[in-house]
Structure formats: structure tokens, C-alpha cells
UniProtKB/Swiss-Prot annotation:
InterPro entries per the UniProt record, alphabetical: F-box-like_dom_sf, F-box_dom, Tubby-like_C, Tubby_C, Tubby_C_CS
Membrane spanning residue stretches: none
Domain F-box: 56-102
Name of a matching Pfam family: Tub
Biased composition annotated in UniProt, kind: Pro residues: 387-403
Protein name: Tubby-like F-box protein 3
Gene designation: TULP3
């Protein structure tokens, strides 16, 4: 029997589950979400006291040596989507098969592939880039991220990865990032993060539902302040968001003829990650999706992060998020933080846009996207690691810098009217790269 037929049999085996078992499972899901609907709920209530008996698959008792060989060959043969869904089906059979998959299927940092949902929160490959593209829907204000399945930059039909929806407000713009392609709302339980801008569209904060590693210099955590009569959020799953990055744009002296000047301060990624032997600590093992409809009403996250817009010459953020009118060199030199015990925490990674070069023949400013961008646009950019200055008061030994200071970590560019390529690599994740690229779509009133 071939390995594909084994996977096919396993996938078909899911259909043998009894309707009773399915309804019991569905009842537990309804109990978690708190959504109830008429007759369906009444029939489910009758099954609440019954134990969920789900028949074990006949493949669950296979010898570990055989399972390991099956997943090893499956991982090697089904390396691209859509056939890679067979690897996901393998992991969905039972706990034993899932644990076997964890041992064999590596994270994107080492295999360069997006397989399971948690892959979108894990760093990209160290060697090479993961190629994606973003489709913009102007009428619905939505943005969809797809994994490229072809080398043709304008080819569609890729594997869906993430989606975002823009919400314009009086003083800011918000982008809700979701794991589903349709029905994106702030109250959805499939949201994994958010992007918020200031009034001018020059400063952005990336929020994540995933907590960062302990050593990160992260500003205040935003906890929701729910209305007293709200019953949508379970007390077991609080709406908590973490400020993991800040994106800032500065006045572009080239106007619309050159790329925007931007910097990204990645609070959840240490600067040492791009040094030889560096790592990104605290990588998640599972996705933590949450509803975000009220996650920005906290006094610590909202009122301190984005103050009144009556005076733009002053800082619009609290001291830990100070972007005020300081220049980028001042910002990068003041991001060393510490905890209440005086312990110095690790400096976050800072990314800057790669400056363009003047092309004498074309008489324009150019960046080398290696064929991945075909249309000139002010939105196009390439990000590289900015040099990290030594901590204040510390001795100045020869500290290792980035292995390759000019290595492009993230590039984004236009290939059609509403289609843009997005290529990223270690230490950024797909979620972080997507959020940074979303900031490029927003109007920059003070930069152009």
C-alpha cells in the first residue's frame, strides 16, 4: 500500500465518526463560544451529560518505527501546497501521530515551509526567503496574504495564509489580522493581532495575542476593559494584546520618486538574533486567537499609547513608546529597557529601509528586488537590520554585528494594480512581515 493511499484512508476515516460523537464535540464548542441557536442548542443540551465516545482510528496503533518512516517520506514527497495538506491530515489523526509530526516536521526557520497554523508566528528561513503576495480589495478594505506557488510574480491561486481588514476611525486607522479569509471582524475568535496607526499615518503599533519572551523590552500590556453588561468574552480567555513592534515613517526628501524612510522596532525580537549564532527566543508552540473588539480600551494601551491628537509636535505615546519628533538615530539609541529590579533587558532588533541607488540610464532611484517587483511605487521597500549601538556605560569591545548588514530581511513591492509581493526571512515571521507591509498601504499625510 502506498503512503498516499494510507493518508487517503486516514482522511476518509474521519467520516466514520458517529453523528452522536460529532454533536457532542459540537456541543462543547458551543459551550466555549457561548453562541446558541434554537433547536440545535436544545438537541445539544440533551447530550451534555453523555460522555464523548469517539472511536479510535485503526491506524493509531501502528508501530512507532513505521509511523516515523511514513511521516519522513510524506514530509519529503509532499513539500509544496496543495499536496502538503496530506502532512496536516497525518497530524490530525490522533495524539500519537501528532507528536510524531512534531518530531519530524521542522519549523520554517529550518525547513523553509509553512505547514501548520503556528508556522505563521514562527521565524522564516535563515537561508532563502518565503515568497508571498498580498491581494488588495479596495471596495471591501481587505487584504489577503497568500503563499506563492509559482515563480511568476503575477500568478494567482496561492495558498491562503492571513487576511486583514481596515477600520477607519476619527483619529486613527486599525487593521484587524485574522486567520480566516472571510467575515473579518474585531469580535471574531480567529483574530491573532492588530495594527494601529496615529492620525497622520506615520506611526504604527503592532499588537499580538501571543505573549513575547521574558527578556523582551515590551511596553505596557493592553488588557480589555469590558462593559459590565457584556457577555461575549469568557473569563477563561481574557482579551490581552501585546505591543510587539513599532513602525515609524519619516519625511521622504525624494517625495514620491523614492521609497519611504521607515524604521521598525521589533520589541519581541532581540538584536542579537541577527548576529552569528543568534536565536529568536520564546517561539510559540500554538496559536492564541482572540476577539479584539474591546482590547484597545485599556487605559494603559490606549490612552497612554495614543494621546490626544491636538498637538502633534509633542509625543503621542508614553515614554516607553516615544516616537515624538526625535530622529531615528535617537530612537535606536534609547530603546534599552530594564525591569523593576534594575535588570537590563536585551536590546530589541531595529530594521531600517535600504536606501535606493540612482540609476543613470533610467534617471530614477532604484532598488534591486531581483525580479520580484515590476511596478515603481512609493510603497515599495526593502528592510535590513540597523546597526546596534553598544549599551550606555558599557565597555566597547568588538561586539559582533549582523552577519550580513545588507541582507534583505523583508521586501515588499507592487506587481499589479492591487497585487503586491511580500518576501520575508529570519528573524521575522509571516504575521510580523504582513503587519509591517499593511502599514505601507496607509496614507502618509506628513511624509510625501
Amino acid at each position: 500500500m502506498s503512503f498516499r493511499s494510507i493518508v487517503r484512508d486516514v482522511r476518509d476515516g474521519f467520516g466514520s465518526l458517529s453523528r452522536r460523537s460529532f454533536e457532542v464535540t459540537l456541543a462543547s464548542l458551543y459551550g466555549l463560544t457561548g453562541h446558541h441557536k434554537g433547536k440545535t442548542q436544545s438537541s445539544l443540551d440533551e447530550l451534555d451529560d453523555s460522555p464523548a465516545i469517539i472511536p479510535e482510528s485503526r491506524w493509531a496503533s501502528l508501530p512507532p518505527e513505521l509511523l516515523r518512516e511514513v511521516i519522513r517520506r510524506l514530509e519529503a514527497d509532499e513539500s509544496t501546497w496543495p499536496s502538503r495538506r496530506n502532512v496536516v491530515c497525518f497530524a490530525a489523526v490522533c495524539r500519537t501521530w501528532r507528536e510524531m509530526c512534531k518530531e519530524t516536521v521542522l519549523s520554517p526557520e529550518f525547513c523553509g515551509k509553512l505547514t501548520f497554523p503556528v508556522s505563521i508566528k514562527q521565524p522564516g528561513p535563515r537561508d532563502g526567503m518565503i515568497q508571498c503576495y498580498i491581494k488588495r480589495n479596495r471596495s471591501k478594505s481587505t487584504y489577503h496574504l497568500y503563499l506563492c506557488l509559482s515563480n511568476v510574480v503575477t500568478a494567482e491561486g496561492g495558498k491562503f495564509v492571513l487576511a486583514a481588514k481596515r477600520h477607519r476611525k476619527t483619529t486613527c486607522t486599525e487593521y484587524t489580522i485574522s486567520m480566516v479569509s472571510g467575515n473579518i471582524s474585531r469580535s471574531s475568535r480567529t483574530n491573532i493581532g492588530k495594527l494601529r496607526s496615529n492620525f497622520l499615518g506615520t506611526k504604527f503599533i503592532i499588537y499580538d495575542t501571543q505573549p513575547p519572551y521574558n527578556g523582551a523590552v515590551v511596553p505596557h500590556v493592553g488588557r480589555t476593559s469590558k462593559r459590565f453588561n457584556s457577555t461575549k468574552v469568557s473569563p477563561k480567555v481574557p482579551s490581552v494584546t501585546y505591543n510587539i513592534a513599532q513602525v515609524s515613517y519619516e519625511l521622504n526628501v525624494l517625495g514620491t520618486r523614492g521609497p519611504r524612510r521607515m524604521r521598525c522596532m521589533m520589541h519581541s525580537i532581540p538584536a542579537s538574533s541577527v548576529e552569528p549564532g543568534g536565536i529568536v527566543p520564546g517561539q510559540p508552540e500554538q496559536i492564541v486567537p482572540r476577539a479584539l473588539e474591546d482590547s484597545f480600551r485599556s487605559t494603559t494601551s490606549f490612552s497612554q499609547s495614543f494621546r490626544s491628537t491636538t498637538s502633534f509636535s509633542k509625543s503621542i505615546m508614553d515614554p516607553s513608546m516615544d516616537f515624538s519628533s526625535a530622529r531615528f538615530s535617537d530612537i535606536s539609541g534609547s530603546i534599552m529597557g530594564g525591569d523593576d529590579n534594575g535588570e537590563i533587558k536585551e536590546r530589541p532588533l531595529v530594521l531600517r529601509n535600504k536606501p535606493p541607488r540612482w540609476h543613470e540610464q533610467l534617471q530614477c532611484w532604484c532598488l534591486n528586488f531581483r525580479g520580484r517587483v515590476t511596478i515603481a511605487s512609493v510603497k515599495n521597500f526593502q528592510l535590513v537590520a540597523a546597526p546596534s549601538p553598544p549599551p550606555a556605560g558599557a565597555p566597547t569591545p568588538s561586539q559582533p554585528g549582523p552577519a550580513d548588514p545588507e541582507k534583505v530581511i523583508l521586501q515588499f513591492g507592487k506587481v499589479a494594480r492591487d497585487m503586491f509581493t511580500m518576501d520575508y526571512r529570519y528573524p521575522l515571521s509571516a504575521f510580523q512581515a504582513f503587519a509591517i507591509c499593511l502599514s505601507s498601504f496607509d496614507t502618509k499625510l506628513a511624509c510625501e
